[in-house]
Structure formats: C-alpha cells, structure tokens
Amino acid sequence: MAVLARQLQRLLWTACKKKEREKEGREEEEEEEAGRRAPEGPRSLLTAPRRAQRPHGGAEASGGLRFGASAAQGWRARMEDAHCTWLSLPGLPPGWALFAVLDGHGGARAARFGARHLPGHVLQELGPEPSEPEGVREALRRAFLSADERLRSLWPRVETGGCTAVVLLVSPRFLYLAHCGDSRAVLSRAGAVAFSTEDHRPLRPRERERIHAAGGTIRRRRVEGSLAVSRALGDFTYKEAPGRPPELQLVSAEPEVAALARQAEDEFMLLASDGVWDTVSGAALAGLVASRLRLGLAPELLCAQLLDTCLCKGSLDNMTCILVCFPGAPRPSEEAIRRELALDAALGCRIAELCASAQKPPSLNTVFRTLASEDIPDLPPGGGLDCKATVIAEVYSQICQVSEECGEKGQDGAGKSNPTHLGSALDMEA
C-alpha cells in the first residue's frame, strides 16, 4: 500500500510539473530571444557586472538538512547557469533530497533543460524502492544518459551548446554525487575537505583515450580545439561517431558517480559552477563557509556572500552555488561573532583615517587597495579582505555622505565626493 501511495504521489507530481513546464517553456523562449538581441562585446563581457542575486533556502526538519542557493550573472553578457533544489522527492520515503547546478555554454537552453527535467529522469530511474548504493549509482548514470537523449530529440540538428552538471542526491544513509564537466562539489567533514569531484578535462588519461578512440583530437587542451570539457549534456556535434554508444563518444553525457556513506562528522556540501571555483580553491571555500556558519549566517545569505567574494576576487563568469548543511555543520560561536564585530569596527576606523588624511576622500578602489596592502588580523579564512567588500563599501559610502553634507554647508557644495560601488569592489583590470 505504501508503494502504491508513493507511485500515485509521483504521478500527480509529474502532471503538475508538466503544466509548469509549459508555462516555463514560453518564458524560456522570450528569454532566449532577448539573449539573441543582446550586444556581443569582447569575450561577451559587460561594461559593469550584474551583481543582483535572489538567494533562497529551506530546511527539512526530520533529517536536520538545511540548504541555501544563489546565482549571479556577473560580467557575462548572458546568464547561462541554472540550478534546482528538492528537499523531498515524490514517491520516495522521507530523507531523500536532490540538488543540482548546471553551467551552460553556447547558450542557456541545455542548462535550463537539465534543471527542469533531470530530477524527473532521476526519479524514473530510481523507482519507488531504490537499492543502495550500487542501484542508485546506476540509476544516476542512466538518468544522465536518458536526459541527454531526450534533449537530443527536442533540439534541431543545427542547435549548438551544452552544459556541465553536478548533482547531489541525499538519502538517509548515503550522499551520491554525479557530475559531468567542470561544475564541482566539495564535502567538508570534521573540519577538512573529505571529498571533491574532479573536473572532466580532455587531458585526463581516461578522457583522452576515449576522445582518441572516437576519432577526435585534442588541441589547445580542448576537444577538437574548441570545447574545454570532455563530458556534458548537449554538445551533440561531438556525439556523432558512428557505431559507438553514447558513453564512448568524443564528449560523453555519462556522469562520474560517487557514493559516500554518511557520517556524523559530515558538515556541509558545496556545489558550484566554475565561475566560483576559478577564483577560490575547494579547501579555501570550505574554510570560508565554516567561518561564516560560526557567525550564524543563514545558508542562503552565505551563498550570496560567497558569490560577492568571488566577484571581488576577479571571477568573470556566471556564478551559481548551493550549500547543503548537515546536522554536523558548525554552529554559531559567541567568540567568532565577537571577533567579526571587532574586525568590522577596526575596518571602519581605518577607512575613516584614510578619508580624513586626504584633502578629499580617496576613491573606493584606492581605499580597498590600501587596505589590501596592510596586515589586517582576523580576516575571514579563504575569503580575506574580498569577503569584507560589502562592509567596506557601506562604511565608505557613509563617510562620503557625511563629507558631502559638510561640504554643502561650508562651501556651497565644494568638497562633494562621487563614491563608486565596489563592483564588486575593484574595477576590472585590463
């Protein structure tokens, strides 16, 4: 009876999702058309980054699972990342959840397709009573391949582009990670990185062997001199070697799947697109996340701060991250909060000194570079001064506002300043 109830729940869920997809499909066509009209600059970069984020999160009470997610377009002319979060999975017992980050290239359609349809393929392959762990690993492998085949059937033959993907499937006993390409996941356990996915690049021995066996070449570290990743959804022009199954094509949609037995020391899992990993290592990000959790920061706000930090560190790509916190995640610490407040106060005093020592307030970039050259204690591990960019910008803006008001009163507007946004804090260097 329980199995039948779960099957009915899944059927109802599928019907609801079909209606949602019809509406989303119309919205996607409008977004794609707007994207085609967007002006193309050098490397498809904007003149200023788009920093807007809509962080969101949730919690699953029975299993102690919390998550946060956020995304930012950054300097790119188009947003090609997508993600999805499921705290519960229809048709499966409590304690199962799914999270995915997808990073598109050559357009956003493949990533959006994956975010909307890959969970359904996973559910279909799992069935109502999945066997762990090998049955689930095989189900994830089949789900990626079936989703890729479905995408091929929907796309015109002239369509180009694809996406990388990293999926975290949580069960009460295991953490399953399935990934294609360079979207990455890191597990923190007992204060250290316990597991990290490895990017699928053409020069990895296994990838190189498959590419050459399928008649392909590797030039400039890229498949056929063009594609930087060797596994992806979509990219069907690289999947036409005759007589070879999908997993043995030049570019494969077959994921690498890991099954990690859950432990009480598990703290959190961070999933992110390469716009995040390009600027900060996995170990550094894990340290930064742990330090922010000790401040009591909600996972979704923490994700937003991570993306701001990566933007300030120089990321030029779209950025998406999902933080999944387990019961063993670091808890708020009064000492950590006290030290953070002291750091903010010290930064405020130093910025005031820098502005007061000049005839007119220096630019925000000058203030930031000056602070970066100084030895400031207790900066966030892994994030450094970049993690405090928002605080610095807010303090600077307040000081300039006071200076403006004083200038208006004293010299009829003389001495006004024109503060810039830390955009992320520093102008993009040529």
UniProtKB/Swiss-Prot annotation:
Coiled coil (residue ranges): none
Top-level taxon of the source organism: Eukaryota
Keyword match Metal-binding: yes
Any one GO biological process: positive regulation of canonical Wnt signaling pathway
Annotated signal peptide: none
Domain PPM-type phosphatase span(s) in chain numbering: 66-326
Keywords: Hydrolase, Magnesium, Manganese, Metal-binding, Protein phosphatase
Gene Ontology CC, one term: cytosol
Pfam families tied to this protein: PP2C, PP2C_C
Annotated family: Belongs to the PP2C family.
Protein name, per record: Probable protein phosphatase 1N
Organism, scientific name: Homo sapiens (Human)
Gene: PPM1N
